[in-house]
């Protein structure tokens, strides 16, 4: 800016003023995205945006959408929204999503959102193992798997094999199969 100073006799003098306009204020995060609980099997169940263990680009619209419900602004403009996720545990998996909001001058602000992913739906048994009639005088005649009066490990294959014909499924996968037998009316 150039200033000109004049007196009554027409004499003038000028000077220059420098005005620096600089945005030094970080963007505002009025509301961090809300905590979310998702039914699922792990981080692959997270959308809006997808899980990312490395810094990933997003948008102000996604930060503020109906899923996340964050609120951000800047005295100039928000120019960048990124996030990075850190997952801990299984059943449930708890994800800490760190959002970073930036403006054109490189000012940033961050906040953390918690996303919990958990499988709360029990496995489905579509068909229980069929009734079997076995020739023999005691429980030692039972095979596939052997008779056990205490909880014993088995496998999905044994439950579903040609002898037992059971059918079971789970959206997150079946991780164990056990069985226990009770003998009723066995020949002496």
Spans of features found by a protein language model:
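Proline-threonine-serine-rich low-complexity tracts
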Residues: 1-188
């Amino acid at each position: 800016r150039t200033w000109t100073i004049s007196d009554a006799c027409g004499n003038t003098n000028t000077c220059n003023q420098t005005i620096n306009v600089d945005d030094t204020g970080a963007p505002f995060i009025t509301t961090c995205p809300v905590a979310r609980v998702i039914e699922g099997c792990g981080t692959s169940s997270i959308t809006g945006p997808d899980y990312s263990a490395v810094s990933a680009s997003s948008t102000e619209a996604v930060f503020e959408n109906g899923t996340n419900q964050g609120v951000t602004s800047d005295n100039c403009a928000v120019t960048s929204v990124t996030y990075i996720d850190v997952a801990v545990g299984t059943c449930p998996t708890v994800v800490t999503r760190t959002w970073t909001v930036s403006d054109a001058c490189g000012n940033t602000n961050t906040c953390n959102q918690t996303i919990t992913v958990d499988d709360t739906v029990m496995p489905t048994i579509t068909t229980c193992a069929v009734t079997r009639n076995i020739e023999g005088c005691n429980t030692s005649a039972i095979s596939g798997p052997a008779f056990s009066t205490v909880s014993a490990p088995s496998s999905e294959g044994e439950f579903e094999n040609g002898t037992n014909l059971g059918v079971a499924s789970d959206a997150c996968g079946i991780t164990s199969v056990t069985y226990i037998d009770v003998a009723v009316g066995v020949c002496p």
